[in-house]
């Protein structure tokens, strides 16, 4: 966000707000998050979204109530694709990587999580609801319906 605002001389945050009506929770995702939040495990959102973009998404969806913590890669200065992100996350929010679950729509992020030692990894079959679903997310299983993976 900051980079493109500087590079293009445009208020990218304002442009994102103008398109905010396109922000929505995936079908079944809220029930999935509620079930996780009701369980004994900590639930942490990790995102590459800039804090301004994340705030807008949370304002529109209200899903922040399901998380114990919200971490933007911008907080650490490293994208989730970098091992430095996972090291910083494990220092800020100690967890056992082998027991952690990461659900992400980015295959490079999932590969990075696997390299860090995250034990449970799942992809999103259709990262962009306006585009067709992916045929392959190998080697990661793909979620196409959150209601089918309720804990």
Could you describe each region identified by the protein language model?
Residues 47:
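Conserved phosphate-coupling serine/threonine residues in phosphotransfer and NTP-handling enzymes
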Residues 1-17:
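A metal-dependent, Asp-based hydrolase signature
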Residues 19-20, 104:
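A general structural motif at alpha-helix termini
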Residues 44:
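A short beta-strand/loop micro-motif in the catalytic core of glycosyltransferases
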Residues 13, 30, 34-37, 41, ...:
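Asp-based, Mg2+/Mn2+-dependent phosphohydrolase catalytic module
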Residues 22-26:
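Conserved beta-strand/loop elements of the cytosolic catalytic core of P-type E1-E2 ATPases, chiefly
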């Amino acid at each position: 966000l900051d980079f493109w605002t500087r590079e293009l001389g445009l208020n990218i945050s304002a442009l994102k707000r103008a398109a905010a009506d396109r922000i929505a929770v995936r079908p079944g995702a809220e029930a999935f998050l509620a079930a996780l939040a009701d369980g004994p495990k900590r639930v942490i959102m990790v995102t590459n979204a800039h804090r301004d973009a994340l705030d807008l998404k949370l304002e529109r969806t209200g899903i922040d109530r399901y998380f114990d913590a919200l971490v933007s890669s911008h907080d650490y200065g490293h994208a989730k694709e970098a091992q430095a992100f996972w090291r910083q996350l494990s220092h800020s929010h100690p967890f056992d990587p082998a027991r952690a679950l990461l659900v992400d729509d980015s295959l490079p992020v999932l590969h990075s999580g696997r390299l860090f030692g995250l034990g449970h990894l799942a992809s999103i079959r259709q990262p962009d609801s306006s585009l067709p679903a992916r045929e392959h997310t190998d080697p990661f299983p793909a979620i196409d319906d959150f209601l089918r993976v309720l804990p």
